[in-house]
């Protein structure tokens, strides 16, 4: 079977990483021939073994409506020349483009929404998207909570598959020479969704009592200057660092004691999964969706209300003051995410692709 993947870019991001993991795993295990088509809207960050996976890059320079039209023409031309039996699209824009291109044919399509659709779009756009999603053979979402957001007429098409952890690859990044590094770590795009401001303000309070602890934030984005100014204004330049991107996030996590996810919303937070895999004591906002399906309160991590500096500070203090709790929660977290190991998740993807390919 030939399977074609579609995505807007292969830049740094959770959806891009998941697509690469699934496509590469299929190719490595000889599950048919695999291709990836990227619209190249941002520079490529994630790499793929091009000896096993065919990589196509569609480069259109325009923005807005013109870009959408040009991408539509390019994708339509591409799929006419490609004989993929099943096409799998990631992220809303690419999903809509692929469905529009195949509106009047019988190509088999799986679309994957990777975020909270009610936060990502206006309600009008969401409902228009849902009408177009009727054309898809299957819709993949990451959590049961996200599934409930979609209308009843789509429910039979929706399949919940959590994100995989590529444990075979990531085990080489683990670097646990010892605990008590006195390092807090966070990762994500420096954009409003991630709300790093709440974390930094909470850490500013921590710093007054535990000045030997450090906070490292990995990622880039539109709010970098604003976040750096907040760090400067709070006199945290010696203890809080914006570190840019890292190609080995799990290595950095495994050299840290505490991981924090401060987001307003998520689809299914890869970075939280990876931090749990690395054995960090994890703190996350109780946002929609994902954290609540991963964290059991105070057993393998801590959930705090969104945007609550005081509760974030309290959660940090609990871990900072109690190394035994940090280690216990970190080890429990590692056991929790074993269900996400790539072989376990790939079984679900293989079954889904075979069902769609056979028209079940």
Spans of features found by a protein language model:
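N-terminal strand-loop element at the rim of the active site
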Residues: 5-66, 149-151
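A conserved mid-protein helix/loop that constitutes part of the nucleotide-sugar donor-binding site
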Residues: 13-21, 182, 189-208, 215, ...
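Short hydrophobic beta-strand element within catalytic cores of glycosyltransferases
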Residues: 37, 281-285
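Short His-centered aromatic/hydrophobic patch
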Residues: 89-97, 113
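Carbohydrate-associated surface elements
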Residues: 145, 164
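A short, well-ordered alpha-helix in the C-terminal region of glycosyltransferases
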Residues: 212, 228, 311, 318, ...
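Aromatic "clamp/platform" in nucleotide-sugar-dependent glycosyltransferases that forms part
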Residues: 245, 264
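Conserved acidic donor-binding segment of nucleotide-sugar-dependent glycosyltransferases
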Residues: 296-309, 318-324
């Amino acid at each position: 079977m030939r399977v074609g993947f579609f995505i807007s870019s292969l830049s740094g991001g959770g959806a891009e990483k998941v697509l690469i993991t699934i496509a590469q795993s299929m190719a490595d295990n000889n599950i048919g021939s695999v291709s990836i088509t990227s619209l190249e809207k941002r520079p490529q960050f994630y790499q793929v073994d091009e000896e096993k996976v065919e990589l196509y890059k569609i480069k259109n320079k325009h923005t807005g409506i013109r870009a959408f039209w040009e991408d539509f023409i390019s994708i339509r031309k591409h799929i006419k020349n490609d004989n993929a039996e099943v096409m799998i699209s990631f992220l809303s824009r690419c999903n809509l483009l692929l469905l529009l291109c195949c509106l009047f044919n019988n190509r088999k399509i799986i679309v994957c929404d990777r975020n909270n659709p009610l936060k990502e779009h206006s309600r009008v756009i969401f409902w228009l998207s849902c009408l177009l999603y009727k054309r898809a053979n299957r819709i993949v979402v990451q959590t049961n909570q996200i599934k409930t957001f979609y209308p009843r007429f789509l429910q039979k098409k929706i399949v919940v598959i959590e994100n995989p952890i590529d444990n075979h690859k990531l085990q080489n990044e683990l670097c646990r020479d010892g605990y008590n590094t006195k390092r807090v770590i966070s990762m994500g795009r420096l954009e409003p969704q991630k709300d790093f401001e709440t974390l930094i303000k909470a850490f500013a309070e921590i710093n007054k009592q535990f000045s030997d602890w450090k906070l490292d934030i990995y990622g880039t984005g539109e709010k970098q200057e604003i976040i750096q100014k907040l760090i400067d204004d709070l006199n945290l330049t010696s203890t809080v660092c914006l570190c840019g991107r890292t190609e080995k996030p799990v290595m950095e996590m495994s050299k840290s004691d505490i991981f924090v996810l401060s987001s307003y919303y998520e689809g299914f937070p890869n970075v939280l999964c990876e931090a749990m895999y690395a054995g960090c004591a994890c703190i996350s906002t109780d946002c929609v969706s994902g954290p609540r399906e991963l964290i059991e309160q105070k057993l393998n991590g801590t959930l705090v209300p969104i945007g609550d500096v005081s509760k974030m500070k309290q959660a940090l203090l609990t871990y900072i003051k109690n190394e035994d709790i940090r280690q216990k929660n970190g080890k429990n977290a590692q056991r929790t995410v074993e269900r996400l190991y790539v072989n376990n998740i790939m079984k679900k993807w293989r079954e889904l692709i075979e069902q769609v390919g056979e028209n079940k």
